[in-house]
Amino acid sequence: MADSGSNEEAMKRQAPSVKFDSPSKPDPQQVSQQSNQLSSQKSIQQSTQSKIDPSRIDTKNTTVTTTRPTLDTPPEEEEEKRDGFGNSFEFVLTSLGLAVGLGNIWRFPTRAYNNGGSAFLIPYLTCAFLFGLPAVYFEFLTGQYQGKSPPVIFRRVRPILEGVGWMGVFVAALVAIYYIVIVSWISIYMINICRGHFALWSHCNNDWNNGTSCITMADQYLCKNHTKVMANSTLWNSSLPIPDKMVYFNGACQDANGTDVSTATEQYFMTYIVQPSSGMLDFGGFNWPVFAAMSVCWLLTGLGILKGAKIMGKISYVSVLVPYVLVVVLFINGVFQDGSGVGLEMYFGTPNYTKLYEQDTWTEALKQLCFSLSVGHGGLISLSSYSPKRNNIFRDALIVIIGDTTMSLVGGGAVFATLGYLAKATGQDVKDVVKSGLSLAFVVYPEAMTRMPVPWLWCFIFFLMLFLLGASTEIALVDVFCSCIYDQYPRFRNRKWIVVIAWCSVLYCIGLVFSTRAGYYWFEMFDEYAAGFSSVCTVVCELLVMMYIYGFRNVRDDITEVVGHARNKFTGAIGAHSWYFTANWMVISPSIALILVGLSFVREYPYMGRHDIYPAVFDIFGWFLSFLPVIIVPIFMLLNFIRCRNRGHSYRTLFMLQKQHASYRRIAANYSKDQLALQDQLPDKEPWDEENVDLTDSESESRNAASGDVPIDDVATIDTSSTYHQVY
């Protein structure tokens, strides 16, 4: 009877960390004394007896000593503290909002056109299978299983590697700083469309036009296609008053003095909207319309993340679903325009398979995929941490990949159908009107829209779609850092406005340089350097840490906990449990990412070959931005060494799996005696749990009872011969 009583009492005090005390049977008198002590602490008994998990007892030995539970909070309490999406559909929509962005509309179409047309889909879809889907699936798994932000996740794997989690956070911050500039330009276009400017940007009779260098697109066509050859140029003596002479030289129209001329829509964007100075170091004062637009956009971004994941999920119904509707509307409208067939044929119908043998084609496919999916930005991990732990992440990863690719294909179709119409209307070939990047969105497409019936409507629909795509991505990027602060400083969960205002203000102040007249050149620097190299480095580090340090077998066990066991051999072979993903995360994806890292060093110096506009400081500061997230890793290594010393813990704990990790109990159940003996060195709380509150003894006891923590001095011996036991 004494043994039975001791078993019952011990089962109530079961903890995840176990160590061997002695091979002898427990003394009944000691057990009785401990029982009396436990009976005087009724509140602690009631809270802890439901936390027992006999699966963590080693059956090879008869007596073990247990210590306090090691999870910081029980799962049910943690879910109450941390925000979450209303349902899995909202999580998918918000993830799509981060992945599907402006690059799907203005980068993908021109990259596809320049790299083989429809043949570009072969390397793009191949890279999506080899890199895109595994990367998204991996980041969803990492975030959802732990239910924490990236720095906390990697700190729990090994505290010394906390900086790996911060890498993606800083990449997201760098992208958010300049990404909102594009959203600001788009918002200015939307406002000006409502003011009637859609009828003004297609001709040269406006105050902002340079009368000596402004031409219409029709004039540009005449300049470019005149047959009289003169050396390396073509001279056209126009009967029009402006310009009276133009030369087509080295790919651009020039006037008689050798000055480049530009179309009316180009001048509207560059002269009226951007208002650039002579170079990146010539700041020239503020561009007040851009300054005002940025201020409003930052205000809207702050409001979008102020209420957390639940509100973000609701916003995604509009910011994500509406762009899909609008892009279909634009595609249908473009298809029914005269000349659209020529544009669609250039995009879909004329594959150039010889491009598949060129390295640049595959490189461009990889770059487009990385930028489009936002892998390595910390955002996908952060968003998935708000998702329920049993959510089907493999299904969601497939949806994100399919949704992103669909937007690229349909958006590209809408763009090229419209370009075909514009080429027919101006008497040019499609190749003559194709532009890349910003020019496609802010110059060529508006030019085409003004020639359609009801031009203001189509212009507004196009820029509204861009605004929603950009805003949804910006909100997700800014929220990444805020999530990290909420996790490491829980007291701010109920005062989120402090974190949101502070973080948005910091990014806003840094981004003020974009609202100067040199802002366009600084934007180009951020766009060129901020995300590519650093995001790929982040992916490599995350994969290496999780697959080789945390362990690929543990990752596979995490998958089983999240999505359950494979239903049959077929789903086990190609589904969430497929060994393909394990091999991919260990070898294929890191190799692909390292190739991208190497290729990122191959670029033109100076940028665009214009040392007068882009001096050496452009590339120097650009590379500093690229390496900034990487520098974060050793900085946090040093900080954790200092933190460990100040807390009086052994430095060995910096290289050990922490008790707060979601799989610690499962993994510790298989530890050897020597490994179990080392677990006592691990801290029972996160550093921020010790620093954030100063509790009295009674408050501490109450909190321990609520969280399932038992005072470290209270131990109980357990007879593992009990039949109430199973191996995990």
Curated annotation (Swiss-Prot):
The keyword Zinc-finger does not apply. Its main location: membrane. Residues 106-119, 184-285, 336-364, 418-451, 517-531, 600-616 are extracellular. Na(+) 2 binds at residues 99, 104, 372. Keywords: Amino-acid transport, Cell membrane, Disulfide bond, Glycoprotein, Membrane, Metal-binding, Sodium, Symport, Transmembrane, Transmembrane helix, Transport. Sodium-dependent amino acid transporter that mediates the uptake of the L-enantiomers of various amino acids, including L-proline and L-methionine, and also of acidic amino acids such as L-glutamic acid and L-aspartic acid. May additionally have a role in potassium-dependent amino acid absorption. In response to the availability of amino acid nutrients, may play a role in dauer formation. May play a role in promoting fertility. Belongs to the sodium:neurotransmitter symporter (SNF) (TC 2.A.22) family. This is Sodium-dependent transporter snf-5. It comes from Caenorhabditis elegans. The lineage of its organism: Eukaryota, Metazoa, Ecdysozoa, Nematoda, Chromadorea.
